[in-house]
Amino acid sequence: EIAQCLVGSEMCIRDSYKTIMKKEDLRIVYMGTPDFAVEALRQLVEGGYNVVGVITMPDKPAGRGHKIQYSPVKQYALEQNLPLLQPERLKDEAFVEALREWKADLQIVVAFRMLPEVVWNMPRLGTFNLHASLLPQYRGAAPINWAVINGDTETGITTFFLKHEIDTGEVIQQVHVPIADTDNVEVVHDKLMVLGGKLVLETVDAILNDTVKPIAQEDMAVVGELRPAPKIFKETCRIDWHSPVKRVYDFIRGLSPYPAAWSELVSPEGEAVVMKIFESEKIYEAHQLAVGTVVTDG
């Protein structure tokens, strides 16, 4: 079959090679930065997949002492003696050439940065991303937060092939995950992190076995309007006490424990103190107090 393909087209050569390739031979480059991205990398390494290189953010000073800290992905990569690149600019010629020398068949992106086409279009089998929502819902930087803030009872995890517009590529696989009424963003994050690692492996296996049937996001059925998941800033986290009880409750758990919902406690003298609120309870009862009044039990 291979000899016949060599006489034919390049596509035929690629398809035959893909059919006979084993996971140990598939050259994978992995890109990610936070804890969420470590789980999938760990499962790839422990599963015997051939991770030939890791790309993560440059080291940055953190904390009051401004000490240089490694990203969680870098820490794991060093522990496993994996080759590592930390580019400042993803279009830098030196970085692109170093990446090309790894000769990746497939690239995997989990919680990293928006990639230029020169990077995501490099591997012969493409580049896929793991996104913490049921795309096309919650495209953007903070999908887990916004799903909880909006009071959703279900979210999920998606793998999709990268294209030019962010989070819009063809969907490969999805897993649905329930959100309990008491879940905060940390609980949902951890659920998706573990399932995401498994989904990455399943996606790699599907690509290896040539069983992928990607679906364009515009062809997917969506209930209701598409909701975005923009980056969250400090002012985004300010509680609006004029909102309904459930809205405030969901808002607090959707930002807990990080970056945390906040409000100002104003003294009779007019002095304001910022306080972060990590947990709340819904209580429905009649009262005559003004909205925003602080009531204590002693």
Q: What kind of feature is each model-predicted range?
A:
Residues E1-D15:
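Single conserved hydrophobic/aromatic residue that forms the stacking wall/gate
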Residues M21-G65:
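N-terminal Rossmann-like dinucleotide-binding module
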Residues V38, R42-E46, V96-R100, E117, ...:
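Amphipathic, non-transmembrane alpha-helical secondary structure
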Residues V222-G298:
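Internal anion-binding site segments
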